[in-house]
A protein has these predicted regions:
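Beta->alpha turn/N-cap motifs
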Residues: 59-61, 70-83, 149-150, 167-173
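Pocket-lining segment of extracytoplasmic ligand-binding domains
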Residues: 148-239
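Bilobed "Venus flytrap"/periplasmic-binding protein-like clamshell domains
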Residues: 21-44, 102-164, 168-170, 270
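Secondary-structure end/capping motifs
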Residues: 210-278
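A local structural motif
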Residues: 46-57, 137-149, 285-291
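A structural signal for short loop-to-beta-strand junctions that line the ligand-binding cleft
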Residues: 25-26, 88-96, 119
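Hydrophobic/proline-rich hinge and linker segments of small-molecule sensing/allosteric domains
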Residues: 91-112, 191-207
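Hydrophobic residues within well-ordered alpha-helices
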Residues: 67-68, 157-158, 279
Length: 295
């Protein structure tokens, strides 16, 4: 298996293997099934012409912060974090998470009319989920927001530590088990309001480390192999699936790995422009340059 373990925790200074003249690149993405499914071939040396990758698995709030420091050559981040990163990184047109029917949820234990004046747990300050929630709740904001590890959000809401919790990914398949209900599906809200898919996670390539065109080619080949040979990545995906049931893993991949993962296309870029344009207009992010397709 051609995967090097991380040499240090995210946030610590990592030794750059290229300093020793090695053809190694640093990549970071989440242990979620959509990411491990997409990147399996790439990080296992199955993509011709690609370098060997040193892999870090981390939640997106961690990779958002690490990308600000330029720690990785190829990295999965929230689209909400992209405006702070484009001086160093290039947005790639593939490998990310964008689609319909896959948006974040605001969950509650007890019926609430809104989150106005409430205490809400969120997975990160620069996550797309939180940005969407802020846009949705512009006129009725919560009184308090706490950044909480994703795995602790649903248990915390169920225990009454928070009035509401903002969740993503597999939580949409499992929140009922915690006795919770959805106050709002932010993806449905976004799609109804804009007619566009919801941009969640982006793939960025560090401009001074990788050729973005080459990186795009590698990722597209990794996706092609994932779709053509899904059994090849099965053990790897399940290993990192955080005790997720196989049926939930399959639902997760089916929802988040789609045509937009292979190529953002016209609708994908329009969705990203709409999200970041609205965020800038609301004073929530810096402006971004034109994000026209790279290739």
């Amino acid at each position: 298996m051609n995967v090097a373990p991380p040499t240090s925790a995210p946030g610590e200074r990592q030794r750059d293997p290229r300093e020793a003249g090695l053809n190694v690149a640093r990549i970071a993405f989440s242990p979620c099934p959509n990411d491990t499914f997409v990147f399996h071939a790439l990080v296992h040396g199955l993509v011709p012409g690609a370098p060997r990758f040193e892999v870090t698995y981390a939640d997106v709030d961690v990779t958002n912060t690490a990308a600000e420091r330029g720690e990785y050559d190829l990295v999965k981040v929230s689209y909400a974090a992209v405006p702070w990163l484009l001086d160093r990184y290039q947005l790639l047109p593939c490998g990310g998470a964008l689609g319909r029917g896959c948006g974040p949820l605001v969950l509650v234990r007890d019926p609430l009319p809104s989150i106005e004046g409430r205490h809400v747990a969120v997975p990160g300050e620069r996550t797309t989920a939180y940005l969407l929630m802020r846009l949705w709740a512009t006129n009725a904001p919560p009184a308090r927001v706490s950044v909480v590890p994703f795995a602790d959000i649903m248990p915390g809401v169920a225990a009454g530590h928070y009035d509401a919790g903002l969740v993503i990914h597999e939580a949409r398949f499992t929140y009922h088990r915690h006795g919770l209900r959805a106050l709002v599906d932010l993806g449905e809200w976004w799609e109804s309001d804009t007619g566009l898919p919801i941009p969640l996670g982006a793939i960025l390539a560090r401009k001074d480390a990788l050729d973005p065109v080459a990186a795009t080619t590698w990722i597209k080949e990794s996706i092609r192999q994932a779709w053509e040979h899904p059994d090849a990545s099965r053990a790897y995906v399940l290993e990192h699936a955080q005790e997720m049931e196989p049926a939930v893993v399959d639902q997760h991949i089916a929802l988040y790995v789609n045509a937009f993962t292979e190529d953002l296309g016209t609708d994908g870029y329009a969705a990203v422009d709409a999200l970041l344009g609205r965020a800038y207009a609301a004073g929530l992010t810096p402006p971004v340059p034109d994000l026209a397709p790279m290739i």
